[in-house]
Amino acid sequence: MNPAIDLNCDMGESYGAWRMGNDEAVLQFVTSANIACGFHGGDPSTMRQTVAAALAHGVALGAHPSLPDLAGFGRRAMQITPQEAYDLVVYQVGALAGVAASQGARLHHVKAHGALYNMAAKDAALARAICQAVRDVDSDLVLYGLAGSALIDAARAIGLRAAQEVFADRTYQADGQLTPRSQPDAMITDLDQAIAQVLGMVRDGSVRTPDGQTVALQADTLCIHGDQPDALVFARGIRLALERNGIAIQAA
């Protein structure tokens, strides 16, 4: 059986007059959209427009909840309790679910954004709170989380379906965590390097760290960041490479 992968992209992250990403163009290459819910980006009109665009392209709808940090784009860590994490996720997923329902659609998945995602990947209590929030809103939702992380463990523990996420444009550390963006080797900007990393993760179940170590991981869904300068080039090139290698592309 040939391997399969979901291609997801964070989008709907514009806010008012401030514009982010190239959503409409990227949508033709992905199978899942992680849509901002207002706390790091995504005003109500942007949420509505992004849901409509995703539906028009047959792309699965996902909520992309964040810490309450518009100024920092949700990328700054905050000290929050598990209860606060639960409440933040319920509030934001509920908001996007309402937008989807107004257009006759339902959400497919939830993927935390930025610092909330990274914190919960390591913090079991936060991971449990986020997964419980998702399950309490809709037990049919899929939890997208960093491959091999506390989020995946927490989802499985409560019977929530989980999709293990890998990244095309980020490097990995020996413990399977993403290299922090503050480090110079965190981002992959060369398309050929990104494609080689993607094929290794999808076909071989492993990734090479910048210092040459090999880390095992499972790849169910691949993130393509829509806010990078070459997002469209990456999305097109990665999808073409996957198809040429006989890898099916479908929502997780």
Swiss-Prot record:
This is 5-oxoprolinase subunit A. Forms a complex composed of PxpA, PxpB and PxpC. Its EC number is 3.5.2.9. One of its GO terms (biological process) is carbohydrate metabolic process. Catalyzes the cleavage of 5-oxoproline to form L-glutamate coupled to the hydrolysis of ATP to ADP and inorganic phosphate. Keywords: ATP-binding, Hydrolase, Nucleotide-binding. The gene is pxpA. Belongs to the LamB/PxpA family. It comes from Bordetella parapertussis (strain 12822 / ATCC BAA-587 / NCTC 13253). It comes from the Bacteria. Gene3D superfamilies: Glycoside hydrolase/deacetylase (3.20.20.370). It is an enzyme of class 3 (hydrolase). One of its GO terms (molecular function) is ATP binding. It catalyses: 5-oxo-L-proline + ATP + 2 H2O = L-glutamate + ADP + phosphate + H(+).
